[in-house]
Amino acid sequence: MPSSLLGAAMPASTSAAALQEALENAGRLIDRQLQEDRMYPDLSELLMVSAPNNPTVSGMSDMDYPLQGPGLLSVPNLPEISSIRRVPLPPELVEQFGHMQCNCMMGVFPPISRAWLTIDSDIFMWNYEDGGDLAYFDGLSETILAVGLVKPKAGIFQPHVRHLLVLATPVDIVILGLSYANLQTGSGVLNDSLSGGMQLLPDPLYSLPTDNTYLLTITSTDNGRIFLAGKDGCLYEVAYQAEAGWFSQRCRKINHSKSSLSFLVPSLLQFTFSEDDPILQIAIDNSRNILYTRSEKGVIQVYDLGQDGQGMSRVASVSQNAIVSAAGNIARTIDRSVFKPIVQIAVIENSESLDCQLLAVTHAGVRLYFSTCPFRQPLARPNTLTLVHVRLPPGFSASSTVEKPSKVHRALYSKGILLMAASENEDNDILWCVNHDTFPFQKPMMETQMTAGVDGHSWALSAIDELKVDKIITPLNKDHIPITDSPVVVQQHMLPPKKFVLLSAQGSLMFHKLRPVDQLRHLLVSNVGGDGEEIERFFKLHQEDQACATCLILACSTAACDREVSAWATRAFFRYGGEAQMRFPTTLPPPSNVGPILGSPVYSSSPVPSGSPYPNPSFLGTPSHGIQPPAMSTPVCALGNPATQATNMSCVTGPEIVYSGKHNGICIYFSRIMGNIWDASLVVERIFKSGNREITAIESSVPCQLLESVLQELKGLQEFLDRNSQFAGGPLGNPNTTAKVQQRLIGFMRPENGNPQQMQQELQRKFHEAQLSEKISLQAIQQLVRKSYQALALWKLLCEHQFTIIVAELQKELQEQLKITTFKDLVIRDKELTGALIASLINCYIRDNAAVDGISLHLQDICPLLYSTDDAICSKANELLQRSRQVQNKTEKERMLRESLKEYQKISNQVDLSNVCAQYRQVRFYEGVVELSLTAAEKKDPQGLGLHFYKHGEPEEDIVGLQAFQERLNSYKCITDTLQELVNQSKAAPQSPSVPKKPGPPVLSSDPNMLSNEEAGHHFEQMLKLSQRSKDELFSIALYNWLIQVDLADKLLQVASPFLEPHLVRMAKVDQNRVRYMDLLWRYYEKNRSFSNAARVLSRLADMHSTEISLQQRLEYIARAILSAKSSTAISSIAADGEFLHELEEKMEVARIQLQIQETLQRQYSHHSSVQDAVSQLDSELMDITKLYGEFADPFKLAECKLAIIHCAGYSDPILVQTLWQDIIEKELSDSVTLSSSDRMHALSLKIVLLGKIYAGTPRFFPLDFIVQFLEQQVCTLNWDVGFVIQTMNEIGVPLPRLLEVYDQLFKSRDPFWNRMKKPLHLLDCIHVLLIRYVENPSQVLNCERRRFTNLCLDAVCGYLVELQSMSSSVAVQAITGNFKSLQAKLERLH
């Protein structure tokens, strides 16, 4: 038991969490008890048979039949069967015996509650319950040899023919129909009135010859097959069908012992001189589809009818000698004469045992158990017949005082009960009853026995078909439900005692096999009260907890006839139910949980497993000395860790609380009431056909009748607990609890030198601690009983309505949840589901225009824990809301909606907010959505813990704050979801009503209430305005976040609220999506003309290290920041703003270079992974020029970018600059190598012009001399046009005088390169081109400079002519000389 439940009894104000924990603990107790009830042993385990090849024997030990030994006086006088009720034969029948000539037989047909008698060729039937309703058939002329009642095959006869009566004579087999006028459907019980009961149809349905086969017995299977036993030792079957076919007759006889075609060959005079072994008995196991036969000589044969019951094959045959030999080898000390003859065989169905299939009873009362297949294989087909156990009857143990059975001539075995009719003398029988109902969990098997005298010879002995409660097997519990039926003690609260009928010539003898509860009732009535030695012995025999559970069946009975017995049972419950105890660790073995039943109390060397309710064989051992322990049950650790428990007084750290029999009896009884449904699925899916469609419906897994029965039992238990609230106090009628405290502290070791007074106080404290723990547990169980009753009452109410429709109203998720929910879950933890089911039920009323007040009051009456006053308010509000849908008057509709809103607001913290808001949306009551959601948020978090949690950074350790925060957000979500719906609708593409989707008449819109785009937009604006009025800061924040999320930032920026700026600032600092919030923040500042703040936010955005922002966006942010900064400086003249603007402009310059680097890398090296990483890096942040140069421009050899960086930095290094220009030119030439010469010249010219225009104004970064020289060398090398460089420089805008100066210096430098290239006149050609351009267009030089430049040109030409004259004459020299002389003349004309 958790420590939280040990402090004190649960007060009314106990928290919901503590109540829930108590319920969970109570549920676990029930789970454990239910599991223990289901762990009953199989018959093979009771018989200690582990496998077919390991046979065992029992019956020779005193403990096999505890009542046969000297312990008899210690056991209460418990009758096993009720007093016998004798019903004489109808007087008309007695007269018929005088007319008998050949033969008479008698038997019972339990399915129709009839006994039958044949006298020669006539058969009579009557109701054996009262001797009335006598019917007869005298339509046969031959003596009747065998009689059988058959439930016919389906679909062959008319529905009123419920059974067939099969009669066999020496000549033919006649099949008659039985119909019933007043048969109760499904009950199998005939109406007792003489006028309207059974009718025997006069004309036979079938008649076929016996072919001279003497038939001895007739039996049928549940599926309508008819088997007959022949005196010739053969097994026959009558096969019948509706109509004859080409190769089959309507009715024919098949001999399964010889040939399937034997009906074609008559057996003439077969039984006249036969030495065959007649078959005396046929037994059919309908649960496994196996048929057994027993012959006159004791041969047992096994036939497999197939998995589906339609086959037929003989699989085994064992002779009586083989059986006797096997039994003798198993029970070697027993005289073999008791093993034969076998007088009866009985099937053991799979509801009783999975491993044992057949029981044979001998004339001495010995039971022989057989198996037909390997153990633990429930689906295996029979393949053998193996004797696995020999059970001797009472009287074979050494100390037995009971006389052994003898001369058994008739036996009946049914569900563990063996009845044997033994001949006492010629006129009378002794009826033996042997069973293990008292000890169903005890291994090896222990049985009780009793005998009763029977007047007359027993002609027939039969069990009356009992009421059977169907197991509720569902997907959730199918693996936990045993295949075999629970013992009687587990089911006795809901099943009546088993009924038997014995027929003799004097009439029918009716009696019941008493259940333990019937035996207890007998003791209470006999003792006229709840006290007495016999009752105390009953409690010791069954153990306190099991006896208390049995006692509760009577104590909780609400029947008027049980009122006095109920009071006696209550007294016995409290008197003998024990007390809670504290068990201490001890060096002695723990006390057995077996009470002193037949002798002195003893300690068991190992306690019986918890929940094992029956005695341990050791209870007849040597008595031990010491405290006599009352019966105990599963202990619960009360204090500390059991591992630390000690045995002395100085360190009692780990005692265990052992609950009383009263406590455990209540648990057991409750678990047995609920056991059939506790862990079953609430619902099952069933598929049925509607026309050609298959429809899946969800139905209750438990029928109403069973619910009614469970509710009746639960109500009795609940009233008992409410009536006897003192059960958690001290022992009844024993106020002096301290006197016996030490007896309740099991294993407590008295300290040698302890203070007696101190020890007594400690003992008293421990005892009260155990009492308190039990009281708390019982209160939890009481609450569980109450909740269970109310949950099942609700479930029954749902079943009485249209359950399938109610469930269909649920949301799909809840329907799926329903499929995986057990009744236990529904009771303990599924309040949401019960609420939804109730809401669905009420909605069905509302939909049918029925008032909900009546059903609401009924719900409050039957399940107030599930349907409170608040729930009733909710139902009323829901009714108003639903009724408003029907109202056409706008004012009235608004009034009803307003009224519903007021009702909902009363319980807004409990209402299904999303559902109500969805309905408000449907009726366009958007104001209600906002108001109800905000009210709900306030009620769920009245102290504002959610906002506190949010503002303090959402600390993980603040669980309460987190819960309040989530509750508020869930409430706000209803508003934002509604806004979202309106947004979506306002943007939806309107459908053109003029264009039909398909041919035919116009189709109405599927939703006539759908909003138009304009209406949706209007409602959105109205709702947004209403939302903005809220003073709820956390809601405002939620609204802002939603607007951002759905890209309605423009709407957000229109909000005039004091909460907006702090929220954006906060989110820009802490949210993972900082970029988005900073972007909104600068826009907010800009909109509110706070330009300085906008510029600084934009600057932070540009500087932010983030992969969300591209480099291009960063440049845009800086550009926007510069604009805002300029606007700020225009408004105010703060020096800091001016400095900030300067910083922004410098930042922009560097950023552009960074962009240039990135674009260059993307353009030239995009396929390299390292380049891709570099490009991403350049996107992630703004870098300084040092980093750009060292980490990007230089490593990737980006000459242009390096030139831009040193230009930006103002760094002057002529050699570096020249190298960069050379790299730029060479890179461009390299990139264009595949192009034609003209294209290459064009590409290079574009590049030089582009860069020249940037750097020509700063000669340090545009070394003209070097560039012209390098370019001319490339032109010379590539044989390009002579004027290429001059044209390029002209496009850059280099002045002609400066260009002439450069070329003149190049020529005069006499670089050997030109001679090496064999073009010594190249530069003169270039100068000639340059000057010709001037002559042709003198305006290239300013007018004021023109004369001086012309003179300069003439002087230079003269110099060039002198140089040419000094050169050796050649065609090229002569040509250039002529060109310069012509030029000279033109220049002189310009002079």
Swiss-Prot record:
Record-listed Phosphoserine modification sites: 1057
Keywords, in A-Z order: Atrial fibrillation, Disease variant, Disulfide bond, Glycoprotein, Isopeptide bond, Membrane, mRNA transport, Nuclear pore complex, Nucleus, Phosphoprotein, Protein transport, Translocation, Transport, Ubl conjugation
Annotated localization: Nucleus, Nuclear pore complex; Nucleus membrane
Organism: Homo sapiens (Human)
Name of the protein: Nuclear pore complex protein Nup155
Region ranges (Disordered): 985-1012
Annotated glycosylation sites: 526
Covalent link (Glycyl lysine isopeptide (Lys-Gly) (interchain with G-Cter in SUMO2)) residue numbers: 740
PTM comment, free text: Phosphorylated. Phosphorylation and dephosphorylation may be important for the function of NUP155 and may play a role in the reversible disassembly of the nuclear pore complex during mitosis. Disulfide-linked to NUP62. The inner channel of the NPC has a different redox environment from the cytoplasm and allows the formation of interchain disulfide bonds between some nucleoporins, the significant increase of these linkages upon oxidative stress reduces the permeability of the NPC.
